[in-house]
């Protein structure tokens, strides 16, 4: 009996390993790990899951009408000295297109889920909107709302020349972010730059934390609590970026999901947990636009009868095939927005209104 159980366990392990290995290779491109967001340690999971439970109890298990949030955004566009509108110094129109995509996805008005009948009941409205900041940290009016353009020459290295993923992420975190970040308790800082041609990673973020956890590598602090995305992923279907499969703005949506406390749907290990009971387990990330239902019960009998939730924003599938968050994911995001430093003050400073300080004019 024991021998049979061991043999079965070994067979299941080999099966899951094979599935995960297959999913780690996108047949159309070398995009094995699209997100560079570090996996948070157990200490963070324990703390944040406790906060989620407190939030549920406070809001009657999330069944009352929850608050609406508006997050002011500043896009730091890193370029190589080219004219505005020439990549990577993308136009304000591309930024506006990306903002529209954020508001659609986080406003629960993404792609109509009727074609995915099994999961239509799990589509939730996060009730989160984004606006372009009108003023800088000194309260001066921005020439372009929500945009801060920066020549890469100030860093001595252009990120478009860095092909190693870890080197690229380290450069963003330890050189770029500390030099340009605006107060993360007031702004959602979004840094845009290009990557080296053979780098795989498309974005990264930091998880929310309380003051005692800000020393952990995976969570945000005053110098690194910003989201980074590859510029060619920025846009929407009407004004797209240029990266095939990932040109419609969903990369930034996913990274902001991490910024608001969401884990990947596969829990970052084979059949791991994202701590959301309404996202079925998955053996790993999915790519492309899988035929649905995809990988039914991949993690065990009866665990995902409708297949893996490949249309969830927190997967790696193509932008055209991702659109939804679930109620449990919304609760985690609202927990971050209401109870975490660097999140719970966002939107309280009037940064998207027109009360501002203008520079003094010439003497008359």
Question: Where are each of the predicted segments found?
Answer:
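Primarily auto-inhibitory N-terminal propeptides
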Residues: 19-106
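Bacterial Sec-dependent N-terminal signal peptides
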Residues: 1-28, 102, 358
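Intrinsically disordered, low-complexity regions enriched in Ser/Pro/Gly/Gln/His and often acidic
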Residues: 9, 13-16, 40, 175, ...
């Amino acid at each position: 009996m024991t021998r049979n159980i061991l043999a079965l366990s070994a067979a299941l392990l080999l099966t899951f390993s094979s599935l995960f290995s297959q999913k780690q290779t996108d047949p159309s491109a070398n995009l094995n790990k699209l997100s560079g967001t570090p996996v948070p340690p157990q200490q963070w999971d324990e703390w944040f899951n406790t906060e989620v439970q407190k939030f549920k109890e406070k809001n009657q298990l999330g069944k009352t009408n929850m608050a609406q949030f508006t997050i002011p955004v500043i896009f730091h566009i890193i370029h190589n000295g080219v004219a505005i509108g020439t990549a990577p110094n993308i136009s304000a129109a591309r930024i506006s297109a990306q903002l529209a995509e954020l508001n659609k996805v986080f406003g629960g008005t993404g792609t109509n889920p009727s074609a995915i009948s099994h999961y239509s009941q799990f589509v939730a409205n996060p009730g989160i909107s984004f606006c372009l900041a009108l003023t800088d940290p000194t309260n001066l009016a921005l020439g372009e709302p929500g945009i801060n353009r920066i020549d890469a020459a100030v860093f001595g290295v252009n990120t478009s020349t860095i092909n190693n993923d870890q080197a690229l992420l380290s450069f963003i975190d330890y050189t770029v972010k500390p030099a340009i970040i605006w107060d993360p308790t007031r702004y959602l800082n979004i840094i845009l730059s290009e990557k080296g041609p053979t780098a795989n990673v498309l974005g990264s973020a930091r998880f929310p934390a309380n003051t005692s956890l800000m020393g952990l590598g995976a969570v945000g602090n005053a110098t690194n609590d910003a989201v980074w995305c590859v510029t060619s992923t920025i846009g929407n279907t009407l004004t797209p970026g240029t990266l095939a499969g990932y040109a419609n703005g969903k990369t930034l949506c996913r990274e902001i999901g991490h910024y608001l406390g969401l884990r990947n749907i596969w829990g970052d290990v084979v059949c791991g947990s994202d701590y959301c009971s309404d996202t079925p387990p998955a053996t790993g990330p999915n790519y492309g636009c899988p035929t649905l239902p995809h990988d039914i019960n991949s993690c065990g009998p009866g665990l995902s009868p409708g297949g893996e939730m490949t249309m969830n924003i927190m997967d790696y599938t193509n932008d055209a095939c991702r659109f939804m968050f679930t109620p449990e994911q919304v609760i985690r995001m609202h927990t971050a927005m209401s109870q975490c430093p660097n999140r719970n003050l966002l939107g309280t400073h009037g940064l998207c209104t027109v009360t501002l300080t203008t520079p003094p004019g010439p003497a008359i």
